[in-house]
Swiss-Prot record:
UniProt record, GO biological process: regulation of defense response to virus
Keyword Aminoacyl-tRNA synthetase: no
Region (SD1): 3-41
UniProt keyword terms in alphabetical order: Antiviral protein, Disulfide bond, Lectin
Purpose: Has strong anti-HIV activity against T-tropic strains of HIV-1 and weaker activity against M-tropic strains of HIV-1. Inhibits HIV-1 fusion and infection of CD4 LTR beta-gal cells in vitro. Inhibits fusion of HIV infected CEM-SS cells with uninfected CEM-SS cells, and fusion of HIV-1 Env expressing HL2/3 cells with CD4 LTR beta-gal cells. Binds to HIV gp120, HIV gp160 and to a lesser extent HIV gp41. Binding to HIV gp120 is glycosylation dependent.
Pfam families in the record: SVN
Disulfide bonds: C7-C55, C20-C32, C26-C38, C68-C80, C74-C86
Region (SD2): 51-89
GO molecular function: polysaccharide binding
Protein name, UniProt field: Scytovirin
Species name: Scytonema varium
Length: 95
């Protein structure tokens, strides 16, 4: 990863969950081991304050992927639309 607040969903990595080819494919301060697995300390479960660095996995929302009841269920600076979908720009690289 790129530091304790770096947000990356390792489950979606091209080589499979927690598999990596570089540090950017590992969450938080984790690094990619020589055997191709993410290792070390991931980000804190708390997504932090809402804004461009806010990290939230919309795929796990109760109403379904990208569905929301409030903006805290949307990644980065995205907001929840009146129709219940996350909209706008996510704040981190997506897998």
């Amino acid at each position: 990863g790129s530091g304790p607040t770096y947000c990356w969903n390792e489950a979606n990595n091209p080589g499979g969950p927690n598999r990596c080819s570089n540090n950017k494919q590992c969450d938080g301060a984790r690094t990619c081991s020589s055997s191709g697995f993410c290792q070390g300390t991931s980000r804190k479960p708390d997504p932090g304050p809402k804004g461009p660095t806010y990290c939230w996995d919309e795929a796990k929302n109760p109403g379904g992927p990208n569905r929301c009841s409030n903006s805290k269920q949307c990644d980065g600076a995205r907001t929840c639309s009146s129709s219940g979908f996350c909209q706008g720009t996510a704040g981190h690289a997506a897998a």
